Design a protein with these regions (language model features):
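Alpha/beta enzyme core
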Residues: 2-276
C-alpha cells in the first residue's frame, strides 16, 4: 500500500472535470492548481482538495537538476504522468507537452494521444502562440482538451533571453491579449498565463470565456498554480517573486498544501508582493 493511501479522497466523491472548472469561472470560485511528479505527492494534493494537477516539464529542473526544461523528453512526461494519475481520485490532470514534441500537427497528435493513453492525462498543455495556434486547433478538432500556455514560455528561454516578465510594453500586452483570444477561438479549453503584469492578467481573464490560470499573473485570473517544490520550500536558491513559502507556517506537507488551497480560494494569495 502506498505511504499516503490513507489520505486519499473518497473515490465516491465527484472528480473535477473541465465542466467543473468552467462552472468555477462562471461562479467566481478560484481554482487551486499545483504541479506534481509522483504518486505519493499526488495523494497529498488530492487530500488537500487541489482542483488541478499539472505534470509539468518543470520536472527537468526540480527532479532532474537541469537549468531549463529543454532536456525533458516525451518518455519522461509519460512516465511521471502515469505515476501521478495513480495517486489521484479527484483532481483534474493536465500533462505537459515537452520541448519539440509538437513541431508538426501530426507529431503533436501522436504525442498528445500518448500522454493521454499511456500517461493518463485528461488534458495536454502546449506553450502556445503564433504557429502553435494551428496545432491547438488541430488537437481540439480531434477531441483533445488543450491548455494553451502564454507569457513566459520556459521552453523558449534560449531564444527570448532568459526568465523575465512578458507583456510589460503596450504592444507586447496587446499581442498577448490577441493571442489568447485566437487560442480560445482555436479551441483551447484553458489558458495558462506565466509572468505577466497583473493588469494584463486581469484583462485577458475578462476577455476570455475559458478559465485562465496564472503563475505570476496577478490576483484577478481564475486560478493560481505554483511549482510544488517551490511552495513547499524544497528547492534551494533564489525563487521567483510570485512564490510564497507555505511551509513557513505549517507543521507538515499536507497542512502546507491545505494552506495554499485556502489562500487561493479566499483570495489571500497572491498578495501584492507576489505580483508584477
Amino acid at each position: 500500500m502506498p505511504m499516503y493511501k490513507h489520505l486519499q479522497q473518497d473515490a465516491s466523491r465527484p472528480p473535477v472535470t473541465l465542466a467543473t472548472l468552467q462552472r468555477m469561472k462562471a461562479d467566481g470560485e478560484k481554482i487551486a492548481c499545483l504541479t506534481c511528479y509522483d504518486a505519493s505527492f499526488a495523494m497529498l494534493l488530492d487530500a488537500a482538495d487541489v482542483d488541478v494537477v499539472l505534470v509539468g516539464d518543470t520536472l527537468g529542473m526540480v527532479i532532474q537538476g537541469h537549468d531549463t526544461t529543454v532536456p525533458v523528453s516525451m518518455d519522461h512526461m509519460v512516465y511521471h504522468s502515469a505515476a501521478v494519475v495513480r495517486g489521484l481520485s479527484r483532481a483534474f490532470l493536465i500533462g505537459d507537452m515537452p520541448f519539440m514534441s509538437y513541431p508538426t500537427k501530426e507529431l503533436a497528435l501522436t504525442n498528445a494521444v500518448r500522454l493521454m493513453q499511456e500517461g493518463g492525462a485528461q488534458m495536454v498543455k502546449l506553450e502556445s502562440g503564433g504557429k502553435q495556434t494551428e496545432i491547438v486547433e488541430f488537437l481540439a478538432g480531434h477531441d483533445i482538451a488543450v491548455c494553451a500556455h502564454l507569457g513566459l514560455k520556459p521552453q523558449s528561454v534560449h531564444k527570448t533571453g532568459g526568465f523575465r516578465v512578458q507583456g510589460r510594453e503596450r504592444e507586447a500586452a496587446a499581442r498577448l491579449l490577441d493571442e489568447s483570444q485566437r487560442l480560445e477561438a482555436a479551441g483551447a479549453d484553458i489558458v495558462l498565463l506565466e509572468c505577466v503584469p497583473s493588469e494584463l492578467g486581469k484583462a485577458i481573464t475578462k476577455a476570455l470565456h475559458v478559465p485562465v490560470i496564472g503563475i505570476g499573473a496577478g490576483p484577478d485570473v481564475d486560478g493560481q498554480i505554483l511549482v510544488l517544490y517551490d511552495m513547499l520550500d524544497i528547492t534551494s536558491g533564489r525563487k521567483p517573486r510570485f512564490v510564497r513559502n507555505f511551509m513557513e507556517d505549517a507543521h507538515d506537507n499536507l497542512e502546507a498544501l491545505k494552506g495554499y488551497v485556502r489562500a487561493v480560494k479566499q483570495r489571500e494569495y497572491p498578495a501584492p508582493e507576489h505580483c508584477f
